[in-house]
């Protein structure tokens, strides 16, 4: 599906037509530049690769510099592929936030905030051991039993335990588009989207 790369600016709120205060996320969507056009004959599938945010040549590897020079564009910091654009695009074309003028809902892909090593209560919503009497101590937020004894004599794969939380690729579907501001490349989306302020997100129609 067609889309754009963008940067999460932060959250604010706007008033709807009936006077309700609606929380929304402000995203700087594009402008993105077409850096490669893939075809079924050459690449096995049809897609358009776009780049977002300029970066210096000295921070770009030589293979990527050749890739950008072939497209006739300046080096880009972030690249992503999209399919099924309605209009035919050429190398070097610019795609702006006006792509979403007729979109009522979008999907947003981002990287969730990293929270470090967390226990089972925060990471998986466990209730803890529960009782703090009958000899229990220092067990309020522990997972409890993680398996049987002599059989199967192991912990099964996939057992929910403490570990690294956050920093995952998260997709939020069907978020309502509240407003498109082309002159500032801004997109206002109802509710929250994954990631922290300044993080890169993918917006798909």
Swiss-Prot record:
Top-rank taxon: Bacteria
Keywords assigned: Ribonucleoprotein, Ribosomal protein, RNA-binding, rRNA-binding
One Gene Ontology MF term: rRNA binding
Pfam families: Ribosomal_L3
InterPro entries, alphabetized: Ribosomal_uL3, Ribosomal_uL3_bac/org-type, Ribosomal_uL3_CS, Transl_B-barrel_sf
GO BP: any one term: translation
Gene Ontology CC: one annotated term: cytosolic large ribosomal subunit
NCBIfam families named in the record: L3_bact
Similarity comment text for this entry: Belongs to the universal ribosomal protein uL3 family.
Subunit structure: Part of the 50S ribosomal subunit. Forms a cluster with proteins L14 and L19.
Protein name: Large ribosomal subunit protein uL3
The species this protein was found in: Phocaeicola vulgatus (strain ATCC 8482 / DSM 1447 / JCM 5826 / CCUG 4940 / NBRC 14291 / NCTC 11154) (Bacteroides vulgatus)
């Amino acid at each position: 599906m067609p889309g754009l790369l963008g940067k999460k600016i932060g959250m604010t709120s706007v008033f709807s037509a009936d006077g309700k205060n609606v929380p929304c996320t402000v995203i700087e969507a594009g402008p993105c530049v077409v850096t490669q056009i893939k075809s079924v004959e050459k690449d096995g599938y049809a897609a358009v690769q776009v780049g977002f945010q300029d970066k210096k040549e000295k921070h770009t590897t030589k293979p990527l510099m050749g890739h950008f020079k072939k497209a006739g564009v300046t080096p880009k910091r972030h690249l992503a592929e999209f399919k099924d654009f309605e209009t035919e695009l050429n190398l070097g074309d610019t795609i702006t936030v006006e792509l979403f003028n007729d979109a009522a809902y979008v999907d947003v892909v981002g990287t969730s905030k990293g929270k470090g090593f967390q226990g089972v209560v925060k990471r998986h919503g466990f209730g803890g051991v529960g009782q703090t009497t009958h000899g229990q101590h220092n067990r309020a937020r522990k997972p409890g039993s993680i398996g049987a004894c002599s059989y199967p004599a192991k912990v099964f794969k996939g057992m929910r335990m403490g570990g690294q939380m956050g920093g995952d690729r998260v997709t939020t579907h069907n978020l309502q588009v509240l407003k498109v501001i082309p002159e500032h490349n801004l997109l206002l989306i109802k509710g929250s989207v994954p990631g922290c302020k300044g993080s890169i997100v993918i917006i798909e129609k």
